[in-house]
């Protein structure tokens, strides 16, 4: 009987430790505030777009600056940020279709169904 009780107790302890996500990692966003409204374009090295995810419910846009100046968050609602994202998407589309002679418009959409970050250089 003691063996059965010990087995049940051990099973409950193991089952209690198995979880899908650590509670301490919830709501961990890279950007702690709303971010900058603009940065100098000549200082931009890379633009990363992070859609909302289980670990962060905000849409984040992080830019890496040249010359080791680090990373900064951009305000996703600012006009400057939307223009930077449009240029980055347009540049990426041109790189993926180098022999295309057609032109089109790119519409800004800050919603995404995937949770993987998108990076543009």
From Swiss-Prot:
Name of a matching Pfam family: IL8
Subcellular location(s) per record: Secreted
Gene3D superfamilies to which the protein is assigned, alphabetical: 2.40.50.40
Lineage: Eukaryota, Metazoa, Chordata, Craniata, Vertebrata
GO cellular component: extracellular space
Protein name, per record: C-X-C motif chemokine 11-6
Family note: Belongs to the intercrine alpha (chemokine CxC) family.
Source organism: Danio rerio
Signal sequence bounds: 1-20
Signal is among the record's keywords: yes
This protein's record includes keyword Signal: yes
Low complexity bias spans: 100-115
The entry's keywords: Chemotaxis, Cytokine, Disulfide bond, Secreted, Signal
Alphabetized SMART domains for the sequence: SCY
Region (Disordered): 95-121
């Amino acid at each position: 009987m003691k063996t059965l009780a010990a087995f049940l107790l051990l099973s409950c302890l193991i089952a209690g430790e198995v979880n899908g996500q650590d509670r301490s990692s919830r709501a961990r966003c890279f950007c702690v505030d709303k971010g900058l409204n603009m940065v100098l374009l000549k200082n931009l090295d890379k633009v990363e777009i992070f859609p909302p995810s289980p670990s962060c419910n905000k849409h984040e846009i992080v830019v890496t600056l040249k010359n080791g100046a680090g990373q900064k968050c951009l305000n996703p609602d600012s006009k400057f940020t939307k223009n930077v994202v449009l240029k980055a998407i347009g540049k990426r589309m041109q790189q993926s279709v180098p022999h295309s002679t057609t032109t089109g418009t790119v519409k800004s959409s800050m919603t995404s169904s995937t949770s993987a970050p998108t990076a543009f250089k």
